[in-house]
């Protein structure tokens, strides 16, 4: 299965759907779904996902290179892994999504959207995770969902962590730092993201990794993400990652800006970068009689997008943590 990406993009079913790699077994579970199981018993399970948005191609190319290293034997596998290319049709078309944003649909929220390829795919991915985690006795469960951002950012690489009732494990946060993430953003409320689903339903340590900016296939400068690729290689092979990195800055979400109607106006232009700072009292958005202003001394914007569909998030406001 050294042509997983090509098969996924073409929508082709392989003639052989399971086989042996270098020290592991592989199973093709469906378009964009590949399970890898080491020959030696392991108690760690990892979801590696990318392509939930079809125009975010750099992480897909990164995963393809990791798979090539595993099949060639230059990389040893020490985790059970489910590789997920989230939205094959959108990836093939080079668009963010075909009908609706799948990363708002998980946790059963797909039932609230008009039926589409994305709602069916979200349901399929939920079932795939349930099957994967229930078929083993993993003591450690991780989910790394790789993305790129629509906008530029004051932090080239950053992570977004779902709301979680328990403290985050230090080795997980340390690995995120070793992977080159410059900032970590902690959600304070549930959401429809893939990582919130895996965390809430299966207890996985989950993070959405935002790596640079969305570009078409073969236009990505993957050298920008060498540190992340190296950390992923070390993780898969069970090698300790470097500890000589600057700890990521930490932020928490303090509010969400939501577009409810065509009267919505977001007062940020197309050049506003992620993590741009705004002072207390700054008017951020208006919608009819409703005004959204900065309530803390300083807040930072994440994912500003004035053109989202009504009812969806037009931005998150953050505060820095000590």
UniProtKB/Swiss-Prot annotation:
Pathway: Amino-acid degradation; L-arginine degradation via AST pathway; L-glutamate and succinate from L-arginine: step 5/5. GO terms for molecular function: hydrolase activity, acting on carbon-nitrogen (but not peptide) bonds, in linear amides; hydrolase activity, acting on ester bonds; succinylglutamate desuccinylase activity; zinc ion binding. It is an enzyme of class 3 (hydrolase). The active site is at residue 210. Binds 1 zinc ion per subunit. Keywords: Arginine metabolism, Hydrolase, Metal-binding, Zinc. This is Succinylglutamate desuccinylase. It catalyses: N-succinyl-L-glutamate + H2O = L-glutamate + succinate. Its cofactor is Zn(2+). Induction: By nitrogen and carbon starvation, and arginine, via the ArgR and Crp transcriptional regulators. GO terms for biological process: arginine catabolic process to glutamate; arginine catabolic process to succinate. Belongs to the AspA/AstE family. Succinylglutamate desuccinylase subfamily. It comes from the Bacteria. Zn(2+) binds at residues 53, 56, 147. Transforms N(2)-succinylglutamate into succinate and glutamate. Its EC number is 3.5.1.96.
